[in-house]
């Protein structure tokens, strides 16, 4: 086990490095409890995450398992049926891209997703098709996509499991052709009795493709716990360098290292 000491002034909570000895952690807790601490550094960085790629068979099987608990075999069987029903393109592919000559088709499919996917609004379609085009990365078959026929037929006649799979493929097309997710990462360093404590936070600046992922998750997925939205990680404002945190409350916590798998 190892220990950490956290300090809080009621708004901002900062935490120490890992401390190996419980006695040492307890001493630090006593030393800082009720005293004042000072903000020594505030570091802000702009970060970005690019949209995901389209699905090949392996990545789709992995995601169908993560979101719906389907086995790889079950996903393949359903994809095969959807392919025979002309609802999806060829499933046994190892490419996550499409070819240059498909640009117009893919653009049309992406734009049609607003009517096809019940959880999407028209403002969420960005259509950055160039992101998913790469002739060199398509050998025999391109990435898995919904078909024009699927959009014409709609999902009315499908089982709920096949619907899930088709919606997963559709939303991935919208994500992959979407905007980057931009956020500001802030790290606040605080000193108390010559010991350093830190707090890290994230503030979304542009949700980009993540907006689609969250809409899909809320609509389809019962698993609400896996990825909490980032706004929970927002730090309180007003903590600039030199600010004093008066009469902080210090607490010690115990942590356990996970055994090797």
Regions found by a protein language model. Give the residues of each.
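Core catalytic DNA strand-manipulation module of type IA topoisomerases
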Residues: 1-261
